[in-house]
Amino acid sequence: MKIGSKEFNIGERTYIMGILNFTPDSFSDGGKFNDIDVAVKHVKEMIDNGADIIDVGGESTRPGYEIVSEEEEISRVVPIIKAIKEDFDIPVSIDTYKAKVAEQAIEAGANLINDIWGFKKDKDMAKVAAKYNVPCCLMHNRDNTEYKNLMEDILNDLKECINIAKDAGVKDENIILDPGIGFGKTYEQNLEAMNNLERIKELGYPILLGTSRKSMIGLALNLPVEERIEGTVATTVIGIMKDACDFVRVHDVLENSRAAKMTDIIVRR
């Protein structure tokens, strides 16, 4: 799979996506990297620590988050994407579910669309992905937590996302799937999904796992956001062991990169 100018050999190793929230209210690091110079320094740190992709977000998706306008989101993400691309040769992902934001981000240099609604919120998203021929990550999400059979329902929901993408002209080789840990699921459902991650492989696409510092970890370990590094690392290792983690999206790049590398050495020989 090619993302930007970089080739990603799926199955060879686990790739690290470093999170850069350019927002004032993200659940984990809101407001921390709101200044472009500070953000660029953090990007360099993530790259030095093993990041293969930088995921830029301009709207928090934490529970109860405030929806921002397309214009506001564009004004947040475009300058930082341009700054990253100017200073570093690394693929950039745009974390958005809005087509206009995605298009402006790609024009600014973004190489991948990461949509927490799997192209279901804004149907023009698939058209943008097809138009620019960029890879896209389709995440499982729901407005509710009512499932008849959790894993079967997740697979069926993801199939719908895939069909939306392909009907718009997105190429098969440009699709990545995300089981959506922490979205549209209860604590118990998140644990069940984690324990059955290998089922996502049945759909035949690369998988991105995003569990970093999430409430599932906080509830399990009774820890605040800033103390969830070890719990996140555990989920990264589990994902790799289940052969269901080609990309891992994390805040704490160094710790997860090292854990992923060690796990890869053991299981991907």
Curated annotation (Swiss-Prot):
It comes from the Bacteria. The keyword Metal-binding applies. Its cofactor is Mg(2+). Pathway: Cofactor biosynthesis; tetrahydrofolate biosynthesis; 7,8-dihydrofolate from 2-amino-4-hydroxy-6-hydroxymethyl-7,8-dihydropteridine diphosphate and 4-aminobenzoate: step 1/2. Mg(2+) binds at residue 21. Residues 14-261 form the Pterin-binding domain. One of its GO terms (molecular function) is dihydropteroate synthase activity. (7,8-dihydropterin-6-yl)methyl diphosphate binds at residues 61, 95, 114, 178, 214, 249-251. Its EC number is 2.5.1.15. SUPFAM superfamilies: Dihydropteroate synthetase-like. Gene3D superfamilies: Dihydropteroate synthase-like. GO terms for biological process: folic acid biosynthetic process; tetrahydrofolate biosynthetic process. The keyword Metal-binding applies. InterPro entries: DHP_synth-like, DHP_synth_dom, Dihydropteroate_synth-like_sf, Pterin-binding_dom. Pfam families: Pterin_bind (PF00809). It catalyses: (7,8-dihydropterin-6-yl)methyl diphosphate + 4-aminobenzoate = 7,8-dihydropteroate + diphosphate. One of its GO terms (cellular component) is cytosol. Keywords: Folate biosynthesis, Magnesium, Metal-binding, Transferase. Catalyzes the condensation of para-aminobenzoate (pABA) with 6-hydroxymethyl-7,8-dihydropterin diphosphate (DHPt-PP) to form 7,8-dihydropteroate (H2Pte), the immediate precursor of folate derivatives. Belongs to the DHPS family. This is Dihydropteroate synthase. It comes from Clostridium beijerinckii (strain ATCC 51743 / NCIMB 8052) (Clostridium acetobutylicum). The lineage of its organism: Bacteria, Bacillati, Bacillota, Clostridia, Eubacteriales.
